Amino acid sequence: VASMLYLDYGKKEGEWLPNKFGGNKNLEAIEFFHHLNSVIRGTYPGFVTIAEESTAWPNVTSDIGGEGLGFSFKWNMGWMHDFCEYMKLDPLYRKGNHYAMTFAMSYNDSENYILPLSHDEVVHLKCSMVNKMPGYTADKYANLRVGYTYMFGHSGKKLLFMGQDFGQEREWSEERELDWYLLGEKLNQGVHTYVKELLELYRKYPAMYEIDNTWDGFEWMNADDAEHSTYCFVRKCSSSKNNLLFVLNMTPMKWEN
């Protein structure tokens, strides 16, 4: 989306012309998105449109009009970057980057977000999700499980690219299928079962999805325990008796109290 919204996107000085107001906004692209989203919503109720927008363009998911583009959801690219950078750190050194995992909540209410772990993160020598994780093989899978738990607890809808649900170990390539034989391996079976159980929890408890992208559905209990690399938060729903408490330890250490 960003490459359409900006006239100067990826271009050097002299390679683009400003709009009639002298700016770099592509007014025709904005009008196209207005028309696209209004037609889809009006013709096919229940359909969603999702924007991969990598800049700070505002109101991508706001109602159509002005700068509101009218998309249903926007990929939270910042969350994806921060999550991957944090999770690939050795757990004993994560405390130095503790707030990478809390930063996305500071702008969580600005859009209707999806938390994506997309194909972009598992190509071009970036490694598969499991091989981004530090440690020996078993440690990698343990880190992946706790990372997914954080993802499912965090505000925003979820997107896992194919193979991430069972710990695909090779990078993705459009030239071959996934390594399905891994479903016969114990560690991969464990991740597959774990993701299945996370999805079952997600369906069962409205607190995990009912109030996304506002502070009414999320409350930090402790976002500042960098020394122990722990996070504690509550996901809320309209029925407060069904709120969920998440406590995550991002190290292999045992902490008391």
Where are these regions (language model features)?
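Conserved alpha/beta catalytic core and glycan-binding cleft of carbohydrate-active enzymes
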Residues: 10-174, 203-257
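Aromatic-rich peripheral "rim/lid" segments of glycoside hydrolase catalytic domains that contact
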Residues: 173-185
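Catalytic cores of secreted or luminal carbohydrate-active enzymes
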Residues: 186-211
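Short acidic catalytic loops
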Residues: 1-5
